[in-house]
């Protein structure tokens, strides 16, 4: 009892104030004793239970000096508390405190670094970021395909996959379709060589909106008959000019000049119509004058009668 109550030797004078009136600095944690290796049948539990005692420094009049002195003197000058058994071995361990002492459970140095061994397979790793799909392998051999005839003398290979194999480009040419045109009533003979031919008459094929048959250009009209008629019956000055233009139309057609023939044809038509109009107007005017003269003559005769 005397060793537990004494904090410092009697020779050291007490210079500190009462221990319960002034705050004391935090005491340094005691150095944990070396831990023993756990047995093989206890590998599922934490490795912090060991035999030994927890030494608590007594806060007496000496403060930290009494704690250091108590740590040097060992169990005789420190308060030891019994530790509750936690998977303790069946027999008393070496250095265990006496049964009458109270021990506190010792915590590991770092509670976040506890070594715990788990049985079973490891958890799967987190899924990695979605990687782009690997590029398709380049074809090394020509894929089987079929031959598409596109033009006379040039063919192209179109594979089944829809792409053209390297070295064999697909040669496409614009479509040149020739539609046969048969005139109405034109018979044609059909049959095998050496056999009798069958003569039949087919109607002309219908013309679609995008199909136009090239017809030969019609030559322009010379208007010679109307020019002669207007010259004789209507107005001869313009009639003679119309006849002259009609002759120019025939001359241009004879040498193959369609442009000059078109121009001369228009002029011959215009002068012929002018001759016709002047002739009609002259006949109307002559008729009116004739009627006026006849009426005037009758009035004059009636005036001079007795």
Curated annotation (Swiss-Prot):
Q: Where is the composition biased (Low complexity)?
A: 64-79
Instruction: List, in alphabetical order, the GO biological process terms annotated in this UniProt record.
Output: learning or memory; long-term synaptic depression; long-term synaptic potentiation; protein localization; protein localization to cell surface; protein phosphorylation; regulation of AMPA receptor activity; synapse organization
Where does this protein have compositionally biased stretches of type Pro residues? Answer: 15-36, 87-111, 121-138
Where is the chain membrane-spanning? Answer: 224-244
Show the GO cellular component annotation of the record.
glutamatergic synapse; membrane; postsynaptic density membrane; postsynaptic membrane; synaptic vesicle membrane
Q: In which tissues is it expressed?
A: Expressed in the brain (at protein level). In brain, expressed in the neocortex and enriched in the hippocampus but only modestly expressed in the cerebellum. Expressed throughout the hippocampus but is most highly expressed in the CA1 region and the stratum lacunosum-moleculare of the CA2 region.
Keyword tags: Cell membrane, Membrane, Signal-anchor, Synapse, Transmembrane, Transmembrane helix
Q: Which residues lie on this side of the membrane: Cytoplasmic?
A: 1-223
Give the matching InterPro entries.
CD225/Dispanin, CD225/Dispanin_fam
List the subcellular locations: Cell membrane; Synapse
> What is the top-level taxon of the source organism?
Eukaryota
Q: Which GO terms describe its molecular function?
A: signaling receptor regulator activity
- Region entry Disordered, spans: 1-144
Pfam families, per database record = CD225
Q: Which residues form a coiled coil?
A: none
Name the job this protein performs.
Required to maintain a pool of extrasynaptic AMPA-regulated glutamate receptors (AMPAR) which is necessary for synapse development and function. Regulates basal AMPAR function and synaptic transmission during development but is dispensable at mature hippocampal synapses. Plays a role in regulating basal phosphorylation levels of glutamate receptor GRIA1 and promotes GRIA1 and GRIA2 cell surface expression.
The protein here is known as: Proline-rich transmembrane protein 1
Origin organism lineage:
Eukaryota, Metazoa, Chordata, Craniata, Vertebrata
Gene field:
Prrt1
């Amino acid at each position: 009892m005397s060793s537990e109550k004494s904090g410092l030797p009697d020779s050291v004078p007490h210079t500190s104030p009462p221990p319960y009136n002034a705050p004391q600095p935090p005491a340094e944690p005691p150095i944990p004793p070396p831990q023993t290796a756990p047995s093989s049948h206890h590998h599922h539990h934490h490795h912090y239970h060991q035999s030994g005692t927890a030494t608590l420094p007594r806060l007496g009049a000496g403060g930290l000096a009494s704690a250091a002195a108590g740590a040097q003197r060992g169990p005789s000058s420190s308060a030891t508390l019994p530790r509750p058994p936690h998977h303790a071995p069946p027999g008393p361990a070496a250095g265990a405190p006496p049964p009458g002492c109270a021990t506190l459970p010792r915590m590991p140095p770092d509670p976040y670094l506890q070594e715990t061994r788990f049985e079973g397979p490891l958890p799967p790793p987190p899924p990695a970021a979605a990687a782009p799909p690997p590029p398709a392998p380049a074809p090394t051999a020509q894929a089987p395909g079929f031959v598409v005839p596109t033009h006379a003398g040039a063919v192209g290979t179109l594979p089944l996959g829809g792409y053209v194999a390297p070295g064999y480009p697909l040669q496409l040419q614009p479509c040149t379709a020739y539609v046969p045109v048969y005139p109405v009533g034109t018979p044609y003979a059909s049959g095998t060589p050496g056999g009798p031919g069958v003569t039949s008459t087919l109607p002309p094929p219908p013309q679609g909106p995008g199909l136009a048959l090239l017809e030969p250009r019609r030559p322009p009209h010379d208007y010679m008959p109307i020019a002669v008629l207007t010259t004789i019956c209507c107005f001869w000055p313009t009639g003679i000019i119309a006849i002259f233009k009609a002759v120019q139309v025939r001359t241009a057609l004879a040498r193959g000049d369609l442009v000059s023939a078109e121009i001369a044809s228009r002029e011959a038509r215009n002068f012929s119509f002018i001759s016709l109009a002047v002739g009609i107007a002259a006949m109307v005017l002559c008729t009116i004058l004739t009627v006026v003269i006849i009426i005037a003559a009758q009035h004059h005769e009636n005036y001079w009668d007795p």
